[in-house]
Amino acid sequence: NLSLRTMVITSATTLKDICEEFRNSTADLILIDENSVIAEPHLNVLTDYPRTASAALVAPQKNGNTFVRQYRVASASSESHKVSTGNRDFVGAMRLSQNQREPILNALTSASTRGAKGNALDLTLVALVRATVRVDAAEVWAAPYVRSSSEYERKLVKDQLAKINMNSVRLRMANRANDGFFSVFFLRKFSKILTWIAVRIGVTPNQITLISFAIGLYAAYQFALGDFWQILFGAILLQISIIVDCVDGELARYTRKFSKLGAWLDAVTDRVKE
């Protein structure tokens, strides 16, 4: 993403360095720990997804070093700060949003004067969270990762990633696993297949939205006819419309093609179908 800047965080990096790098740019800043090995689809969640706030890559972990509540980082750890009950691990990559420029600069400037010990990336996350700057939690799953000073551990994960089909990882990540029970275990099972077909034939997310809308309208027409079999056919069409409606978002996440028009079109057609 050409609108972003990237800064690799080493053991020598300080909070002041990060603050100055962010201050001297008008672009969002990606921070990556030199000891982190992260799959490209996971980094894409930070770099290519539309974001209005800062975000940090985290992975589910019982008693982890980070606490996430309602998809936002609520508490974080460093060498000088500990989380009492964590439910995620910070993977070692985050995005600082220029939409929060002043709060971020104030938080980092204030934190840098305290002289807390620890990795500058961890201290940055702690500083933002404690200053109540919004940091969205971007989940890492479907592929291994590591944040370790051990070269052996990093090489092990790199070798594992080299054997994985990243397109399959993108598809699994696009297929949301945090929806309701019926969506996860029924609708999304079928939508994933349709999404893969859409990728292969080159259909756009907006085209999928219109197809779902057309199926939904025809389902409504069948309901209006009032005959038992037509109502049954309409009910089947409505389920198909709902499944197809999952595909536009999955396709957008897979291809990383997001637009305000697409979001508006999806919202409007959903309301009409309802």
Task: Tell me the role of every PLM-derived stretch.
Residues 37-131:
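Conserved core of the sugar-phosphate nucleotidyltransferase
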Residues 6-9, 54-56, 132-137:
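Conserved beta-strand scaffold positions in the cores of enzyme catalytic domains, especially
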Residues 12-17, 63-65, 143-145:
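A short acidic, often aromatic-flanked loop/helix-cap motif at beta-alpha or helix-coil junctions
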